[in-house]
Amino acid sequence: MATNYIFVTGGVVSSLGKGIAAASLAAILEARGLKVTMLKLDPYINVDPGTMSPTQHGEVFVTQDGAETDLDLGHYERFIRTKMTKRNNFTTGKIYSEVLRKERRGDYLGATIQVIPHITNEIKSRVIDGAAGHDVAIVEVGGTVGDIESLPFLEALRQLAVQVGRERTLFMHLTLVPYIPTAGEVKTKPTQHSVKELLSIGIQPDVLICRSDRMVPPNERAKIALFCNVPERAVISLKDVSSIYQIPALLKSQGLDDFICQRFHLDCPEADLSEWEQVLYQEANPTGEVVIGMVGKYTELPDAYKSVNEALKHAGLKNRLSVQIKYIDSQDVETKGTEVLEGVDGILVPGGFGNRGVEGKILTAKYARENHIPYLGICLGMQVAYIEYARNVAGLTDANSTEFDRTCDYPVVGLITEWQDAEGNIETRTDASDLGGTMRLGAQQCHLMEGSKARELYGAETIEERHRHRYEVNNVLRPQVEKAGLKVTGLSADKKLVEIIEVPNHPWFVACQFHPEFTSTPRDGHPLFAGFVKAAKDNQKK
């Protein structure tokens, strides 16, 4: 079957939840037996978000094949079973970079390179490539209609709709319908103006998703339909909800999936949302609560840890617990002391870069180890736990990472200069390598040691998890740290890189070099997070 395309745009203001709405629609269509994929087109000029500040952009989501992508791809993977790849996210910077590379190579035979047709053709070709092999491809355009940055993407999608045929394409526009308390009613004018903006560039939306803090009344929906040239049944109300996992059922209750299947002439069964109903039941009926202290350096923007936040919630679902996250700035641990860590049932130190606040993270690992508080370290969270153990248990008092101190006496963590990728190829890096796109990225195999907590949790000898780092445990000094009692319980496929460590004689102290949050989903959870949250609950009984 030829691929059908749903193009998702946003209007009026940003941050309305295009990604969540698109992923929720994808979940319904997948529940109808369709093979669905999703793409995100980002208008910024960065080649990828890998070097962007987490406090500006939010987290960088890493795909199975090692692409550093927008956090919306994390939403996509949490809502549907399809795994995202480097083909599912591209930016203006990546498009221009490829077009310029082709021009230098002579592919355009001396033509004058222009936005139309060369940039738009490259966009179309990447959309078609990313959608190949699926029944439905949902393509989200970042930004807001009217932004100058998104114009080439919108023009490319307009052309693609003409070339593929309108019977196989659908434009879905998400817009704001604000409630004005002084007037006591919702206002449709912003939506009308947003659609007018879209029409001015040649795109007539087929479906309107109306974001509001309440359900849009029938009269206003009819008004929007009339003035925006959209069937009334295609004006969908999307109100604020307490959980994003309620949205698939909310969209289905208004017949959005039926409208789309009829539009594409798809003969498929009704959506079976029983798995999502189970998720909502678990979420609404917890048997207890745990408080997790997340100690990081980007805590002013929780979206910087989006996948970690969601993975903790998923672990709560698996344990029938409500998980409350207490965000703690690691610099506060340095300046105010470990008192700021009191009152939590478990401590999680997520990934990060740079030396700001790192001593606070090391103090946090020490506090968790000495006070027998469940600890989960991820990426840098493993490295600081290793440094802390080396300093305070193994007696290597000046132990550090060369990322933070190049002249320390005991560089127990250092730059990885060589590693084996998932395909078995050897990759190399040096201090002179570029900052962007030079980390150990994507899924890598890990061998778990017999008798370890990690082996017990995963129930397997070999696992595969995603990485994003350029520093690792220094094997030269590793014997001294292990001799002091620290257990290395996970190693890379070639046995050269430390992937998991555990502290013995502790209720639950596990730290990993990889990012388990990227593979956690609301339906399946993740064994490390589930084990950590259970240990946090058990800690309350002490």
Swiss-Prot record:
Binding site for CTP: S14, D147, I148, E149, K187, T188, K189, P190, T191, Q192, K223
Enzyme active site: C379 (nucleophile), H515, E517
Regulation: Allosterically activated by GTP, when glutamine is the substrate; GTP has no effect on the reaction when ammonia is the substrate. The allosteric effector GTP functions by stabilizing the protein conformation that binds the tetrahedral intermediate(s) formed during glutamine hydrolysis. Inhibited by the product CTP, via allosteric rather than competitive inhibition.
Additional information: CTPSs have evolved a hybrid strategy for distinguishing between UTP and CTP. The overlapping regions of the product feedback inhibitory and substrate sites recognize a common feature in both compounds, the triphosphate moiety. To differentiate isosteric substrate and product pyrimidine rings, an additional pocket far from the expected kinase/ligase catalytic site, specifically recognizes the cytosine and ribose portions of the product inhibitor.
Residue sites binding Mg(2+) per the record: D72, E140
Sites where the protein binds UTP: S14, K187, T188, K189, P190, T191, Q192, K223
Name of encoding gene: pyrG
Protein name as annotated: CTP synthase
An annotated Gene Ontology molecular function: glutaminase activity
Binding, ATP: S15, L16, G17, K18, G19, I20, D72, K239, D240, V241
Domain of life: Bacteria
GO biological process: 'de novo' CTP biosynthetic process; pyrimidine nucleobase biosynthetic process
Organism: Pasteurella multocida (strain Pm70)
NCBIfam families: PRK05380.1, PyrG
